[in-house]
Amino acid sequence: MNKKRLIISLLAIITVVGATVGSYVYRDTIYSRIARTAAVVSGQEIKPLLDSESRYIRQIVAQDNSTSRTIMWQSDSSEADAVIEYRLAGSENTQTIGATDKVFTDDGSTTYIHEATLTGLTPKTKYEYRVGYGSDRRSDWYSLETAGASVYDVLIYPDSQSGDYSQWEEIVKDSAHRNPRTALYISLGDLVDNGEQDYQWRTWLNSIRPLSANVPLATTLGNHEMYTLDWKMREPYAYLNY
């Protein structure tokens, strides 16, 4: 079998796998391995990102959600060559934009925040994006749909502050499953119980994975985002960075 036919066969398998996965959008191991195999065969070897390089990939609302979108993620070490690639869904014409490499330390924990805003997008249009570093390290592709003038579904969540966030995570999973057409989700403050505690933010960010990479998020500030470890008030540093 020649290279062209092999690549076409692999892409056909990818399509079948993608069509049969569940409603939740997680990293699909089979999909990823086939996609990487196709890349190697075509001469473009892409290395998958480690979890430590691609934590909490998420979409954030931009000033105009119909023509722009902010993408953010975190890594455990500095990555000066962070990038975002994006394209029209199903297209091969990819555009690349550089992302930040901002260090943030709180509660004795350091993370590196990568962020960029895609602009000049077409309203009510489906795109795909992925994040990475340099020219050869990339995440999986995620979906991104710009807003239009039509009616759309929104998920609105009240306080999610919790002890271990297990129940909150189940709420997010269930609501995402029941509302597959969700175009935006909003959290109305008190995202975490203690705004200075790193564990709270890591667990909260992990719990929104059924939505975060593919649906834009808008949050409002609650008083719990402003608490110190000893329950005094401070600036909401973590909230403002994440």
Stretches found by the model and what they are:
Residues N2-I156, R178:
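Acidic, histidine-bearing metal-coordination/catalytic regions of metal-dependent phosphoesterases
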Residues S66, S77, W168, K232-P236:
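A structural signal for well-ordered alpha-helical scaffolds and beta->alpha junctions
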Residues T117, K126-S135, S139-S143, Q200-Y242:
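Extended active-site neighborhood of metal-dependent phosphoesterases/phosphodiesterases
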Residues N93, L155, I186, A218-T220:
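Hydrophobic/aromatic beta-strand patches that form the interior of the parallel beta-sheet core
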